[in-house]
Amino acid sequence: MKIDILTLFPDMFTGVFGSSILKKAQEKEAVELRVVNFRDYTTSKHNSVDDYPYGGGAGMVLTPQPIFDAVEDLTKETERKPRVVLMCPQGERFTQKKAEELAEEEHLIFVCGHYEGYDERIREHLVTDEISIGDYVLTGGELASMVITDSVVRLLPGVLGNHASQVEDSFSTGLLEHPHYTRPADFRGMKVPDVLMSGNHKNIDEWRHKESLRRTYTRRPDLLEERELSKQEKKWLEQIKEGK
């Protein structure tokens, strides 16, 4: 996979893309990450990429020319048109399902905005997707693009050493992840549940499944509205509601 990120602040990505999973993914050649300063594409004699909005108003608006030219340059040798994703608070809310969808692509281009917003023609005639990572305001789209890149890249084949860990992550199954424990078995009187040390894998799996359901019910009940519960899950949920 290839991911290009268009930004005015490329230095922001150095630490994130040079660490942890994203660094390993590049070393394994599972992904090629490129950070491009779209100011390099401006034809303005003042090297500007924004201008005052027509009709007046506060703030500056990103002009279409440098972003269009950057995307066209990055895709001039590609046979299949890539997904061009705008980081935008008005966009579709980012979810695990969306990450899995994007992970199927060969080439992604993320456009990070700044200032007051984008010229509407970028939305209408260039991008294929608009994505928001939450209902809050960020200074620019850079942090959002880092979040999405990490979420997508870790799904690529061979990136994570433990596939089971990926499958069990929160949201991958539609439920929040179950609690985890490690040594010591008794820490200041706080003990690990006996079932986890029983060696009975069937009981352990059932405990983890039920605790995932419990955690989802108490913390993110909205996720259960989107999930078709099995007969056993419905039974557990009734027990959970009764405090069992």
Curated annotation (Swiss-Prot):
Gene Ontology MF terms: tRNA (guanine(37)-N1)-methyltransferase activity
EC number: 2.1.1.228
Record-linked Gene3D superfamilies: 3.40.1280.10, tRNA(m1g37)methyltransferase, domain 2 (1.10.1270.20)
Enzyme class: transferase
Keyword Cell wall biogenesis/degradation attributed: no
Keywords: Cytoplasm, Methyltransferase, S-adenosyl-L-methionine, Transferase, tRNA processing
Biological process, per Gene Ontology: tRNA N1-guanine methylation
Sequence positions that bind S-adenosyl-L-methionine: 113, 133-138
Pfam family, one: tRNA_m1G_MT
Taxonomy, superkingdom: Bacteria
Assembly, per entry: Homodimer.
Described purpose of this protein according to its UniProt entry: Specifically methylates guanosine-37 in various tRNAs.
Name this protein carries in UniProt: tRNA (guanine-N(1)-)-methyltransferase
